[in-house]
Amino acid sequence: LTGERQTVHHPQTEALLWQHETRHAYNAQGLANRCIPDSLPAVEWLTYGSGYLAGMKLGDTPLVEYTRDRLHRETLRSFGRYELTTAYTPAGQLQSQHLNSLLSDRDYTWNDNGELIRISSPRQTRSYSYSTTGRLTGVHTTAANLDIR
């Protein structure tokens, strides 16, 4: 697919009411890397290696940029004036997500069986309980009226 056109015609007269055309570009690996809408700046996907997303731009303006660790897991996402930092446990589980707006920070706690047992944030803490066979049996939250049993 290198382009597409969308048109809207009047149902009775078939007169053209609206038309929009978008072109697409691909890199040497065949992955989409650019979308060019009518009369708008191009949207570009910045990738590396086998197609890992490193960022996106609208014209010359960066929309989002990603930093990854050697396992290609996202560790930092920058978008506008915000930065989201993500950390992982040695087992590869999500450990924390911290946004430079403190109300959006989250910490994740896992038990020795690899089960998520707590998500903590400034607004609430959500705890999970499991049966001996590993089935989720309950969710308790510090927010009112949200417990599930």
Report each predicted region and the residues it spans.
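Acidic/glycine-rich beta-solenoid
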Residues: 1-149
